[in-house]
UniProtKB/Swiss-Prot annotation:
This is Bacteriocin. One of its GO terms (cellular component) is extracellular region. Keywords: Antibiotic, Antimicrobial, Bacteriocin, Secreted. GO terms for biological process: defense response to bacterium; killing of cells of another organism. Narrow spectrum bacteriocin, active against closely related bacterial species. It is found in: Secreted.
Length: 8
């Protein structure tokens, strides 16, 4: 499983 989170 892979999780990508990005907030800018």
């Amino acid at each position: 499983a892979s999780i990508l989170t990005n907030a800018s």
